[in-house]
């Protein structure tokens, strides 16, 4: 009788080993997956800042304000909001998406096109710019570079 009882025991849950590289408790990874959360940081959940990015259309004068996390390129946030901004390479290697920062700060360390003087003049490549504060960007500025 005791043998029959032991064969009917089934584990309710098993925890898969976690990579030593990730150095994350399995419970936090499980909770993240259960809620559908995703992270670029190898399973660790991180907080991200969200900023208001105001786009001033250099051609029409239209103004659009978009919420953008510090882990999203401002061009992607604009497109998510339904805006149609110019772009070409989406890699920071051309000037199609060029804008001018009128206020605030961005991290555009992924870009490889602008030289230091253009950056000092406020030029930004929206396809590879993360907001670092609330900011105002004048768009459609490739012709003014």
UniProtKB/Swiss-Prot annotation:
Chief location of this protein within or outside the cell: plastid
Single biological process term from Gene Ontology: electron transport chain
Matching Gene3D superfamilies: 3.10.20.30
Annotated keywords: 2Fe-2S, Chloroplast, Electron transport, Iron, Iron-sulfur, Metal-binding, Plastid, Transit peptide, Transport
Binding site for [2Fe-2S] cluster: 89, 94, 97, 127
Cellular component GO terms, alphabetical: chloroplast
Domain 2Fe-2S ferredoxin-type, chain residue ranges per copy: 51-143
Family to which this protein belongs: Belongs to the 2Fe2S plant-type ferredoxin family.
UniProt subunit comment: Forms a complex with heterodimeric ferredoxin-thioredoxin reductase (FTR) and thioredoxin.
Chain's role: Ferredoxins are iron-sulfur proteins that transfer electrons in a wide variety of metabolic reactions.
Name of the protein described by the UniProt record: Ferredoxin, chloroplastic
Organism the protein comes from: Physcomitrium patens
């Amino acid at each position: 009788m005791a043998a029959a009882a032991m064969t009917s025991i089934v584990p309710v849950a098993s925890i898969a080993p976690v990579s030593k590289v990730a150095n994350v408790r399995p419970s936090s990874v499980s909770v993240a997956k259960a809620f559908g959360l995703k992270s670029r940081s190898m399973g660790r959940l991180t907080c991200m800042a969200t900023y208001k990015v105001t786009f001033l259309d250099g051609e029409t004068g239209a103004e659009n304000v978009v919420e953008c996390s510090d882990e999203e390129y401002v061009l992607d946030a604009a497109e998510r909001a339904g805006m149609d901004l110019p772009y070409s390479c989406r890699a920071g290697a051309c000037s199609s998406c060029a804008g001018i920062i009128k206020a605030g700060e961005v991290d555009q360390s992924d870009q490889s096109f602008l030289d230091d003087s253009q950056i000092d003049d406020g030029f930004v490549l929206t396809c590879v710019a993360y907001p670092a504060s609330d900011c105002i960007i004048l768009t459609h500025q490739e012709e003014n570079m």
